[in-house]
Curated annotation (Swiss-Prot):
Residues the record marks as site: Cleavage: N101, F102
Broad class of where this protein is predominantly found: cytoplasm
Protein name: Penicillinase repressor
Similarity annotation: Belongs to the BlaI transcriptional regulatory family.
GO BP terms, alphabetized: negative regulation of DNA-templated transcription; regulation of gene expression; response to antibiotic
Pfam families: Penicillinase_R
GO cellular component, one term: cytoplasm
Length: 126
């Protein structure tokens, strides 16, 4: 799984966030959680679960005739891979362009600007 290119759709992120939050969860629990904030059918959610399983992003086990799902990949790992894919696709891998684009187009307050400076200073010390 570590070297495999993994991409998750926006809808699949909803499923993954529930799985990461609960560690082990049934399909019914996932459906209930997503339907609390999104109008989407049971079948659609179950299709997303199946896709994630086929991509080997989640694993499942059966207990008393119910499948339970858990993550097969660390949340931080998939977020980093997704961020790198985004950076490469939209900015040709140029981190400076990404940061400048967000900094110019978002209204950063003084605290956020100072935090960014601190982060950059910490990185430059390494």
């Amino acid at each position: 799984m570590a070297n495999k290119q993994v991409e998750i759709s926006m809808a699949e992120w909803d499923v993954m966030n529930i799985i990461w939050g609960k560690k082990s969860v049934s399909a019914n629990e996932i459906v209930v959680e997503i339907q609390k904030y999104k109008e989407v059918s049971d079948k659609t959610i179950r299709t997303l679960i199946t896709r994630l399983y086929k991509k080997e992003i989640i694993k499942r086990y059966k207990s008393e005739n119910i499948y339970f799902y858990s993550s097969n990949i660390k949340e931080d790992d998939i977020k980093m891979k997704t961020a790198k894919t985004f950076l490469n696709k939209l900015y040709g891998g140029d981190m400076k362009s990404l940061v400048l684009n967000f900094a110019k187009n978002e209204e950063l307050n003084n605290k956020e600007i100072e935090e960014l400076r601190d982060i950059l200073n910490d990185i430059s010390k390494k």
